[in-house]
Each structure stands twice: as C-alpha cells, then as structure tokens.
Amino acid sequence: MELGTLLAQPGLWTRDTSWALLYFLCYILPQTAPQVLRIGGIFETVENEPVNVEELAFKFAVTSINRNRTLMPNTTLTYDIQRINLFDSFEASRRACDQLALGVAALFGPSHSSSVSAVQSICNALEVPHIQTRWKHPSVDNKDLFYINLYPDYAAISRAILDLVLYYNWKTVTVVYEDSTGLIRLQELIKAPSRYNIKIKIRQLPSGNKDAKPLLKEMKKGKEFYVIFDCSHETAAEILKQILFMGMMTEYYHYFFTTLDLFALDLELYRYSGVNMTGFRLLNIDNPHVSSIIEKWSMERLQAPPRPETGLLDGMMTTEAALMYDAVYMVAIASHRASQLTVSSLQCHRHKPWRLGPRFMNLIKEARWDGLTGHITFNKTNGLRKDFDLDIISLKEEGTEKAAGEVSKHLYKVWKKIGIWNSNSGLNMTDSNKDKSSNITDSLANRTLIVTTILEEPYVMYRKSDKPLYGNDRFEGYCLDLLKELSNILGFIYDVKLVPDGKYGAQNDKGEWNGMVKELIDHRADLAVAPLTITYVREKVIDFSKPFMTLGISILYRKPNGTNPGVFSFLNPLSPDIWMYVLLACLGVSCVLFVIARFTPYEWYNPHPCNPDSDVVENNFTLLNSFWFGVGALMQQGSELMPKALSTRIVGGIWWFFTLIIISSYTANLAAFLTVERMESPIDSADDLAKQTKIEYGAVRDGSTMTFFKKSKISTYEKMWAFMSSRQQTALVRNSDEGIQRVLTTDYALLMESTSIEYVTQRNCNLTQIGGLIDSKGYGVGTPIGSPYRDKITIAILQLQEEGKLHMMKEKWWRGNGCPEEDNKEASALGVENIGGIFIVLAAGLVLSVFVAIGEFIYKSRKNNDIEQAFCFFYGLQCKQTHPTNSTSGTTLSTDLECGKLIREERGIRKQSSVHTV
C-alpha cells in the first residue's frame, strides 16, 4: 500500500502507524537521501564590477566539487552569497547574521580588514568557522580560534623578500609602498640595516591620481636601480606603464613586486626591454592537475562578458581566486571526514553557539590537501598557513612552452622559475650558474648597445677615406676590432660614440666623475670599450670585465744621441776604480814578492859556482826586478826572472791567476766598447726622475696614470706626484698626443701605459721607453655597475684569448715600420776614433823612453865624472906625498906615470866590486 493511500484512508491510520512513519522520516530517510551542506560567502563589490573574482572562484569550486562525487559522494554542497559595499563593516555583520540564521557550516569572506574583523567576531562568538583568503593585519592579542587563513603569513613573505635581497647582494634598496600596511608586510626587510650592510630608502606612491612619474623621476635621478614595489596588481600594471614612459625599463633596473599576481599581468610590452623583473608565485602550475583546472577556469572566463581593464591577462586565474578555490575544497575535505554533520540555525542576538562548531573547526585545521596554491596545512594554534612554497619567477624574453593550454603556455613563455622559497627551509635558487652561461647570447641577441670610447691610437682612430663616412664606419683600431669580435660572439648591435669631454674618467674633490666613467654611471652608455684601466676607485662605481690586455706604467722619453767610444775607449771596459785597484795590486804584489824573496834563503845563490867556498851570494828579486815581474805578468808577456822558492812561486802563481781573470774580462768587454755606439740617457728609471728637477715629467690629466701617482703611498711616487701637482699647468697634458709632442720638442718625460709606449716607439725612432714597468694592471671593458652584460662580455673575452685572436689583433695594430735594434747593429771596422788612444800611448811611451834614456845617460856620465875627479884628487895627494916633486923633468914624468897606474888599478878594483851585490 502506498503512503498516499494510507494517508487518504483514516480508518487505516493507527497509533502504531504514526510511530512507524515518524521513524521512517527521522532515521531511514536521512540515510537514503543525499545530505545538503550549505556554506556562506560574503563578497564586496566595487563600481563597474558587480561580481568580483573571489565570488566567481567560490562558485567555480562548489560546482567542481558537486560534479566530482569522489570527494563528497553523499553530500551536495550549496551556497548562499551576500554582496556588500566596500568598507561597510555594519552591512557585513548584518549579512553574516542572515547567513548564520539559514544554517551555514562555514563563512567565507569578506576581504577588507574592517569587514573581516566584524564577521570574525560574530563567528568567534557563535563558534562557526570563518575562512579567510586575504592578507590580514596581525593582532597583538589575537584570541580568535574559529578561523583559518590560506593567505601566506606576512612575516614569512617578508623573510622571503629579505632572503632574495641578500641572495642578489643588493647593497642599496628602494622600497615603494602603496599604503601603510606595506610597511607592516615588509618589516623584516626594513629592519635589515641593523643586521646587514644594506641601505634602504623608503618611498610612498602618491594616492588618488596614480601619477607616479614625479616619484620615478626622483628615483631615476638618484640612480635607484633596485626597487621593491608593495602594491596591488592593478597598481603594478599602471606603475609599469609609467616606468616604461620614464625610460627606466632597461637592463640596469631590477624591480621586485610583492603582489602574488605578478604572473597574471600582461607584460608582453616589457619582455624585450631587458629589464630585470622578479616576483613570487603561489600557484603550483608545475602540477598538471593544477594546469588543467586553470585552463577550465580560463575557458569559462573567456566566455563571460568582458570585465573592466585591470591589467590582467584575459581569463587568467589570480592568486585570490586560487586561494578561494582551495578554501572551499578544504571545507569540503573536513565535512567529508565529519559524520552526521548537523548544521543548525543560529541567531546572533541569542549568542547560542553551534554545538558542532569546535569539532568542525578542528577538522578543518587538521585537513591537508595539495591544491592550486601548493600543499596546504595549518597551524592548529593560530589557524595560519604553514609549510608553503613560493615560486621565484623572473621575466624572460623567450622560453620553452611545456604546457598544453594557452594560459599555461603563456606562463612558461613569459616567466622563468628561478627558485623556490619554503617557509621552513628558506631560499633555494634552482637557476644555477651553469644554466645561466649555457647560452650567453640570450639577453644580448639583436640588442643595440651604446658604446662610449675615446680617440687614442691605435685603439680608436678616425678612418682615412676619400668618401664621407658615417656611424661606426668612421672609426678603426684595436677596440673596433674587439667590438666586432664581441658582437659576432654575443650577437648584439653597437653604436660607437666618442666621450664628449675626451677624458677617461677621474674623480674630483667633490666626488664627481667625468669622462667615460661618468657616461657609464649616468647610463648614457652600455659599454666603454677603450684603453680604460681597471682601478680600485673606478671599480667602486662601475663594473669591469676581465682584462683584454695587461700592461704597466713606464716612461716615454726622447732617445739620447749616440756617442763615439773616444780615443781612450780602451779604458772603458774597466771602471776607474778597477784600474786603480789593479795598479795598487801590482805594486802590492811586487812589494810582497820583494820582501819574501829577501826573507827566504832559497832565492839567494852563488854567482861563482866554480868557487863553492865564496862567501858572496846574490838575489835577482830586487825592488825594481820585483815590479818588473809583476808588470810582465799583468801584460801577459812574462820576464826572465823566475822564482825558485816555494813561497815566491805561490805569490807568482796567485798573481798569474789574478791577471788571467782580469785580462780575460777586459778582452771580452773591450769589443763592445770599441765597436758599438753607446746611448747614454740622463735617466734610467723612475728613481732618476724623482731625484732631479731639470727634466720635467708628467702624465695625462684625469687618467689612471695620474690617479696612480696621486693615490700611491710609496715615497718615490709621492715625491713624483708632489712635483707634478706643483706644476699642473705644464706637467699634466690633456691627451697622449700632446704629451708625445712635448717629449719630442722639449726636455720632457711622459708617464704612460707601456702598450701605448710600445706603439709610439714602433713608429717614431726618436722615442724610447726608459726603464721597466712601475706597476701592473689591465684594460677592461667597462659597464654600469650591476650590468647583466659584464659576465657575458668576460666569457667572450676569455674565448677570444684562448683562440689567440687578442694576440693577432695586437700584432695587427702594433706592428710598425720598426726601428733598428741596438743589439742587432753589425760591428763596423775600427777607426782611429776607436783605437787612436793606443797609438797615443805608444807614442807617449816611445817619447818617454827616449827622455828616460837621455836622463840615464846624463845621470851616469855625471856620476862617473864625479868619481874620477874624486879618485884623481885622492891618489894625486897620495902620489905627491910618496914622490916629492923634483926640479928635473925626468923625475916628474916618472912620478906621473906611477900615479896614473895606481888610478887605473883602483878603477879596475871598484868596477869589479860593483858587479857583485851582497
């Protein structure tokens, strides 16, 4: 019998039948019929947007759950949606009470902090779960227990930003915030200067008109290249347009946006600008399941009526939509775990809480799920999300389209995932250096770079041509060839411009820079390809590549005139001191030989060997003979005197060894002094320059050489800088050409790089390099500080170095006509001017010998005459006493004959005795 028939017949209705019907309605029917679970959503509306994206995501999630019965097979999820005006907390409270009266298991929304607080207080009083998906201002004494928040904790995001700043090693950071809540969200970064060496400048975006151009102009003037924007994605889209308008969308700027919807913005206009743009992404698009849900969302949104312009890509799911989707799923998972979940109607004015509310709240906090925003778990104490991942994404020009859908294709094409930040483990950058350098042409291909340079032979010169030349064709030189090779490797296009002031770059007393360095600092040029020296002070304001040429400071001076050796050049092989020492040694050896020969008994001999009993002995080594022995050995001629004793032979042998070394050294050195024309320079090193003031010296004004002497702490170089600074008008020159002309025309020495000296001396034989290198340094390609091109330029330079192209380019531009080398001069025939002094010495010796012979003759004659007169007088007296004079002539004659005989006998005796020396 049907139930309708039973009810239609009153006679059949009994008391037992009534109890059976009541049992069926209360117990059997609920178990067989599907259960309905109602949730409530309160969403704020704004002008021109009656339905916000969170409401759409809320409905999308409920529809998805009801279609897929695997999660809630016996339960149908329904919803009640209430719309309120923005900032209307009273209306939010009233609508929340209306929904609680209907019997909802959980309340979602609203978004604004004041409205959230009002709804949260009601849910906390009636013990109904409140689900939040927006950033919430932290409360010091937060006692709310009946809520969860899927939005990442503000403190965790602040730590993530700080970790990224430390990873990029930013020393100066500009923080631009939209409202006061931004300072709370970035408090970890704002407190960083007290713990890290980071300078932070804080600026606020103008409110109301959204015109940030004056602010951006100040940032551009202040060279603020690392900027963190804390703003909504709508404001970010507008700011990016103004950044492009201000010319700040270049590779030297790095912008970081804290909004989690940066990936959803339409950035096609900025992809090829070279700008560095980084942000966080909460959506886990690497999961294929997530990608498919995003594609379904996109298809539904594209079929819907167009929405007002927000800067987002059409159909792109935002983070707030994904969080709302995940929030609905978290409630569904908790309700699935709850058995016989009965939702009762609650009245706000009665303050009677929901009996199952605490249990259901705990089930929600214990739920775990891998949603659109990654793995979701909650802190049971405060209801905040924990252990979440933030993808670190960076804007790129092109990439691999790994996803199947159009939206996912865009995400992979425009954005590159370079790392992950986890709330527990911190930062993990996955974009390794190997990946960065695998294709070094990515960010330089087909990009036009402004190159600043300076006219300096042979690096950059005007090309000689009969036709008018334009652009880069006007120049030639080593640096132009280097630029061409770098362009071939990296694929960039370049525009060469001469530095307006014609200077390399130096810092004045006010800290201001000039020259090419200033061009790079002001970002008027991308590269400085010139003979720009890598120095410490320049490295602090610009970046350099690895050096493409190594060199040092040296002295350029006029080549001294050659001087002939001179007629007495045979004395030059030995210094005057050595000549004096040799003569003293000869005298000393002669005296020692004389003394030893007198002292030793073996140098005395009997002059009459036939008469062994003779007491007369002789010694050949008189003082004159000893000197003659020394001179003969020194002249390599020997003498008739030979030592007999061992002691005298030792003296003679040592003297012979000494003369052997001296004569050999003299002979070996004599040829160079007689055959090679000597170049005598008044200076041989920097020390010689510092010790004198007659020769003026200096360097190029505002160049690295001048800076070297200005900053040097070495006493010699300090003295040289004092000399140059005291004569700045004459010592310092404007450029190298002016300095070279001064070297040629005046008594001036130019301090400059050795490579430039090498080039100049190859083409002007009147100039030469004096001394060695004062220091060691290198030329590098300059870039603005933080430029992404530096590492790529360095890799290309190393490649050219390994291939030998740098050496070939140097040989090409440095090879000149060449000057004859001094060492390669052929020995010419010796003339009178070379060895004429020897003839003078010979003639002087002959003349001297003649005069000495005459002197000896006169001396001997006078000596003999005196002796004869003395003898005659003495023996005349003797004869006169022995034989008195008679008057007869016979007696006188006899007496004279006898006296003459006596005199002759006495002469013979004295002559014989004079032969023997005792």
UniProtKB/Swiss-Prot annotation:
Q: Where are the transmembrane segments?
A: 577-597, 654-674, 835-855
InterPro entries for the chain: ANF_lig-bd_rcpt (IPR001828), Glu/Gly-bd (IPR019594), Iono_Glu_rcpt_met (IPR001508), Ionotropic_Glu_rcpt (IPR015683), Iontro_rcpt_C (IPR001320), Peripla_BP_I (IPR028082)
The residues that hold L-glutamate are 531, 533, 538, 704-705, 753
Q: From the UniProt annotation, give the residues forming the signal peptide.
A: 1-30
Record topology, Extracellular segments: 31-576, 675-834
What Pfam families has UniProt attached to this entry?
ANF_receptor, Lig_chan, Lig_chan-Glu_bd
Glycan-modified residues: 68, 74, 276, 379, 428, 439, 446, 561, 766
Cytoplasmic face residues: 598-653, 856-918
Cell membrane keyword on record = yes
Localization of this protein:
Cell membrane; Postsynaptic cell membrane
Kindly provide the name given to this protein in its UniProt entry: Glutamate receptor ionotropic, kainate 1
Task: List the GO molecular function terms.
Answer: glutamate-gated calcium ion channel activity; kainate selective glutamate receptor activity
User: In the UniProt entry for this protein, what further remark is given in the free-text comments?
Assistant: The postsynaptic actions of Glu are mediated by a variety of receptors that are named according to their selective agonists. This receptor binds domoate > kainate > L-glutamate = quisqualate > CNQX = DNQX > AMPA > dihydrokainate > NMDA.
The PTM Phosphothreonine maps to: 761
Give the gene that encodes this protein. GRIK1
- What disulfide bonds does the UniProt entry report for this chain? 765-819
Q: Phosphoserine-modified residues are where? A: 725
Function noted in UniProt = Ionotropic glutamate receptor that functions as a cation-permeable ligand-gated ion channel, gated by L-glutamate and the glutamatergic agonist kainic acid. L-glutamate acts as an excitatory neurotransmitter at many synapses in the central nervous system. Binding of the excitatory neurotransmitter L-glutamate induces a conformation change, leading to the opening of the cation channel, and thereby converts the chemical signal to an electrical impulse. The receptor then desensitizes rapidly and enters a transient inactive state, characterized by the presence of bound agonist.
Which keywords appear in this protein's UniProt record, sorted alphabetically? Answer: Cell membrane, Disulfide bond, Glycoprotein, Ion channel, Ion transport, Ligand-gated ion channel, Membrane, Phosphoprotein, Postsynaptic cell membrane, Receptor, Signal, Synapse, Transmembrane, Transmembrane helix, Transport
Example GO CC term: the record gives: postsynaptic membrane
Keyword Ion transport present in the record's keywords: the answer is: yes
* Membrane topology according to the record: Multi-pass membrane protein
